[in-house]
Amino acid sequence: TEFPGLGFRGRPAVGLKLESKGWQFLCIRVNNGSLLFSLRELDNQLVVEDTFDFPKQNSDAFLHHFLAAIDTFFQRYQSRVERLTAISITMNAIVDPISGVIYSSPYYAIQDIPLADKIQEKTGVAVFLQHSVTAWTMAESLYGAAKNNTDILQIVIDDIVGAGVVTNGKTLHSNSHSAVEIGHTKVIDSQTQCYCGAKGCLETEISIPQLIKKAQHLAQENPTSILNQYPITVETLCDADRKSVV
């Protein structure tokens, strides 16, 4: 869409604005046990959102049920879908954003799934796969707290341990799925096996589920601990830490 720009001398400038009405993209967030679908206009206006149960499955069943969920979404909301331009998929997993392959996941027993290619074959639109932490960092660099910064490091400790890096304005992954997988850096000799296949990963030591397990063990060894007064959650753990009571 063209609109006139105000000029003081010479020929008036003509600005351009993206016409987003009817042009859409689909966001799919892979959670632990569910898929969140969000259909949006190119200006990020939400059209429709829905959540589908997605139980733990092996690699073959994962891909089959993922494609089936996409079918169900389009059938359910076919009257709301217009000109679909792309599909984005984010998840907590070891992924290769270049090839669109999921290597492994903390939530599902899957390995080496070419998810982006399979969905693109089915839908005919471009598909982008990215680790949720990296996608979050990209969003912060474009629209959030880190806007206008060219060098960004974001570290997230949640169900997973991950990092998003932007250097000189570009997202760092160096054509590799493991460039900033800090959660899978070996930090300790341990028999605890990570879903990536290795042992002693940082994620097996400091992710929130692991911290809660350690707190539960610590509470059992200390009957007078404040942690024994409530169910141990990340909130009660943080509260105990603020009070410096173990």
Indicate residue ranges for each PLM-predicted region.
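Glycine-rich phosphate-binding loop of actin/hexokinase-like ATP-binding domains
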Residues: N148-E205
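Nucleotide/phosphate-binding catalytic cleft detector across ATP-hydrolyzing
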Residues: T1-L16
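Glycine-rich phosphate-binding loop and adjoining helix at the ATP-binding site
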Residues: D50-D151
